[in-house]
Amino acid sequence: MMSKLGVLLTICLLLFPLTAVQLDGDQPADLPELRAQDFAPERSPWFDPVRRCCSQDCRVCIPCCPN
């Protein structure tokens, strides 16, 4: 029975190697607001062109101005 499980495990690892799974460290930053749209902060109504940052609503506009 154990040898059958070993063969099954070996076949599974050959078909789906663990290196094919991306780990959390390999993932880009998860910013759903940025993924949902083609984001350009310069087009945001909160973007301050003089300071080159967003003055309000830092949840959707990045980079956020320090207060």
Curated annotation (Swiss-Prot):
Q: Cite the InterPro entries for this sequence.
A: 4Fe4S_Fe-S-bd, Conotoxin
Tissues in which the protein is found? Expressed by the venom duct.
Q: Which residues carry this modification: 4-hydroxyproline?
A: P63
Give the top-rank taxon of the lineage listed in the UniProt record for this protein.
Answer: Eukaryota
Q: One GO MF term, please?
A: ion channel inhibitor activity
Q: Indicate where this protein resides in the cell.
A: Secreted
Q: Which residues form the propeptide?
A: 21-50
Regions annotated as coiled coil: none
Assigned keywords, A-Z? Cleavage on pair of basic residues, Disulfide bond, Hydroxylation, Neurotoxin, Secreted, Signal, Toxin
Its primary localisation, in coarse terms, equals: secreted
Tell me the Pfam families matching this sequence.
Answer: Conotoxin
Quote the cellular component terms of the Gene Ontology held in the record. Answer: extracellular region
Query: Which cysteine residues pair off into disulfide bonds?
Result: C53-C65, C54-C61, C58-C64
Q: Which residues form the signal peptide?
A: 1-20
State the similarity comment: Belongs to the conotoxin M superfamily.
Domain comment from the record reads as follows:
The cysteine framework is III (CC-C-C-CC). Classified in the M-2 branch, since 2 residues stand between the fourth and the fifth cysteine residues.
Q: What is this protein called?
A: Conotoxin TsMMSK-B021
Provenance organism: Conus tessulatus
